[in-house]
Curated annotation (Swiss-Prot):
It catalyses: (6R)-5,10-methylene-5,6,7,8-tetrahydrofolate + glycine + H2O = (6S)-5,6,7,8-tetrahydrofolate + L-serine. Its main location: cytoplasm. One of its GO terms (cellular component) is cytosol. The lineage of its organism: Bacteria, Pseudomonadati, Pseudomonadota, Alphaproteobacteria, Rhodobacterales. CDD domains: SHMT. Pathway: One-carbon metabolism; tetrahydrofolate interconversion; Amino-acid biosynthesis; glycine biosynthesis; glycine from L-serine: step 1/1. The record marks 232 as: Plays an important role in substrate specificity. GO terms for biological process: glycine biosynthetic process from serine; tetrahydrofolate interconversion. This is Serine hydroxymethyltransferase. Belongs to the SHMT family.
Length: 427
């Protein structure tokens, strides 16, 4: 057999273009401060599991009930992922096959709703997600969505409005959870409202799952009928999703909805990486990590407010804060770009009752999980906040074209900080 290098040639030789792009991305992650709240940095072990030979294996079905042969070892992997997820969140049932956060939510809708049914979800402008009923998303196109939001005076969830809307519209399902809400969710009150109108309570805890696992946010599982979460973000695993419940009937419906309802063969290499991340989150030091994430987010929010940047709801109880830039007279879009040039990565984000268009916005969303994984503590996050204020003030004074000197100065200081907290040595 002629040796074509198929089993031996490394990526740098076989595809230098892709190898080069990956190396550049590694350099970006090493040299920039990552503040996107939905991003994190996985362990070397998670990377290794996701890049394993499990990518070769098709495994339609569930452990012990596959439609393909040769699944005895991937069954071990998936069973470990399931058992670790159940232990981590104290639940009876876990489906670890959803490929993404959108698909995990779609699976619940497929299991519990019919097209045209009514459900309630947090409005995108108040910190919800596209899959919580946005009109441009499948969830908003296939179902009758009644959105709820926050109060204008304090940007906190308006539980009176939520109860009133639930009694008025009688939804079949109420969805709690969001992507840009920085305060503690009252799961018990949501369940009370759901029970009053005979609705399912679904919680999407994608953003705060790591904080729940680490004991820094109340778990929704004692109250929710079904819980979804991504496995990355604050949970620090690979990109993917899962569905949790304590109800055997719902678990059966969810399993059927994920496969064969929504997906075919699961991504076994990703499920292996999920299992590794769950194992890491079960270690005692993960509780320390979760506590540090919250402490860092609070320090950053506090320092931003000292610098004259408004923080939605006046602070944070979790891993993120939402900065309202209107007092500074700059937009989220311009600020995201300016901070990017200074090697601070974040995302533009709408604020409650935002007058700007979705691709412009009046705010930026800032998260602590990735920086905390890197080793940053409160002092580093306060310094990061001061750099953000410096860039924003420069942007307000000099405009987008005249802020290069400020951005270059901050960039040099950012790179010096990053050099003290290296990523993936030897990779």
């Amino acid at each position: 057999m002629t040796d074509t290098g198929f089993f031996t040639e490394t990526l740098d030789s076989r595809d230098p273009d892709i190898f080069g792009a990956i190396r550049k991305e590694l350099g970006r992650q090493r040299d920039e401060i990552e503040l996107i709240a939905s991003e994190n940095i996985v362990s070397r072990a998670v990377l290794e599991a996701q890049g394993s030979v499990l990518t070769n294996k098709y495994a339609e079905g569930y452990p012990g009930k596959r439609y393909y042969g040769g699944c005895q070892y991937v069954d071990i992997v998936e069973e470990l992922a399931i058992e670790r997820a159940k232990q981590l969140f104290g639940c009876e049932f876990a489906n670890v096959q959803p490929n993404s956060g959108s698909q995990m939510n779609q699976a619940v809708f497929l299991a519990l709703l019919q097209p045209g049914d009514t459900f309630m979800g947090l409005d995108l402008n108040s910190g919800g997600h596209l899959t919580h009923g946005s009109p441009v998303n499948m969830s908003g196109k296939w179902f009758n969505v009644v959105s709820y939001g926050v109060r204008q005076q304090d940007q906190l969830l308006d539980m009176d409005e939520i109860r009133k809307k639930a009694h008025e519209h009688k939804p079949k399902l109420i969805l709690a959870g969001g992507t840009a809400y920085s305060r503690v969710w009252d799961w018990a009150e949501f369940r009370k409202i759901a029970d009053e109108v005979g609705a399912w309570l679904m919680v999407d805890m994608a953003h705060i799952a790591g904080l729940v696992a680490g004991g820094q946010h109340p778990s929704p599982l004692p109250n929710a009928h079904v819980v979804t979460t991504t496995t990355h973000k604050s949970l620090r695993g690979p990109r993917g999703g899962m569905v949790l419940t304590n109800d055997a009937d719902i678990a059966k419906k969810i399993n059927s909805a994920v496969f064969p309802g929504l997906q075919g063969g699961p991504l076994m290499h990703v499920i292996a990486a999920k299992a590794v991340a769950f194992g890491e989150a079960l270690r005692p030091d993960f509780k320390d990590y979760a506590a540090q994430v919250v402490a860092n987010a609070r320090a950053m929010a506090d320092e931003l407010m000292k610098g004259g940047i408004d923080i939605v709801s006046g602070g944070t109880d979790n891993h993120l804060c939402l900065a309202d830039l209107r007092p500074k007279g700059v937009t989220g879009k311009a600020t995201e770009a300016a901070l990017g040039r200074a090697h601070i990565t974040c995302n533009k984000n709408g604020v409650p009752f935002d007058p700007e268009k979705p691709f412009v916005t009046s705010g930026i969303r800032l998260g602590a999980p990735a920086g905390t994984t890197r080793g940053f503590k409160e002092d580093e996050f306060r310094q990061i906040a001061r750099w953000i204020v410096e860039v924003v003030d420069g942007l307000a004074a000099n405009g987008e074209e005249g802020n290069a000197e400020v951005e270059a100065r901050v960039k040099a200081e950012v790179e010096a900080l990053c050099a003290r907290f290296p990523l993936y040595n030897g990779l």
